[in-house]
């Protein structure tokens, strides 16, 4: 049992050391405070040039970490991205509309060209339909006028009957 616990203990120890070393390197915890950097133990050679360069390096590190605290994204960049997305979508929409209009114009030309090849039968048919409807309407009006004259008693022996026959024949 003791032989099994040593590898498990080593694995757990390795895991914790990795987690703790990574958690100290995360920027989520913020830059190291100046109090922690300045509270170092002074060694014998505190006035050495190495200590001065080390302090300068720590100042550079603090400035770099402070700059990294700013958000990664920029608001103006997001606005430009939104403008770009809108422009591309709008251009695509205009392209689709122009393609649709072009297609409709081609279809319209095809239909109009087939009509222009043989316009006489189409015109004859429409004229015949109009004439038929107009004749039917005039006959209905003549019948209505005749019935009104009969019902109102205004019928004369010679006046309305010849007109009625003439209107029915038209």
Swiss-Prot record:
| Residues that bear Phosphoserine | 76
Q: What is this protein called?
A: VIP peptides
What is the stated purpose of this protein? PHM-27 and PHV-42 are two bioactive forms from proteolysis of the same precursor protein, that cause vasodilation. PHM-27 is a potent agonist of the calcitonin receptor CALCR, with similar efficacy as calcitonin.
List the taxonomic lineage: Eukaryota, Metazoa, Chordata, Craniata, Vertebrata
GO BP annotation list: adenylate cyclase-activating G protein-coupled receptor signaling pathway; epinephrine secretion; learning or memory; mRNA stabilization; negative regulation of apoptotic process; negative regulation of potassium ion transport; negative regulation of smooth muscle cell proliferation; positive regulation of endothelial cell proliferation
Keywords attached to this Swiss-Prot or TrEMBL record, sorted alphabetically, are: Amidation, Cleavage on pair of basic residues, Glycoprotein, Hormone, Phosphoprotein, Secreted, Signal
Coiled coil (residue ranges): none
Q: Which residues carry this modification: Isoleucine amide?
A: 107
Q: Where is the signal peptide?
A: 1-21
């Amino acid at each position: 049992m003791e032989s099994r616990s040593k590898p498990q203990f080593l694995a757990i120890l390795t895991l914790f050391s990795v987690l703790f070393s990574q958690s100290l390197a995360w920027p989520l915890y913020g830059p190291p405070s100046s109090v922690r950097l300045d509270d170092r133990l002074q060694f014998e050679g505190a006035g050495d040039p190495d200590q001065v360069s080390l302090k300068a390096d720590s100042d550079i590190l603090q400035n770099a970490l402070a700059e990294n605290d700013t958000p990664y994204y920029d608001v103006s960049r997001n606005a430009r991205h939104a403008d770009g997305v809108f422009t591309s979508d709008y251009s695509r929409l205009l392209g689709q509309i122009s393609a649709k209009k072009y297609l409709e114009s081609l279809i319209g030309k095809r239909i109009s060209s087939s009509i222009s090849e043989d316009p006489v039968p189409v015109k004859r048919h429409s004229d015949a339909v109009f004439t038929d409807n107009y004749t039917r309407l005039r006959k209905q009006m003549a019948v209505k006028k005749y019935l009104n004259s009969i019902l109102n008693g205004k019928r004369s022996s010679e006046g309305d009957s010849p007109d009625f026959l003439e209107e029915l024949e038209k």
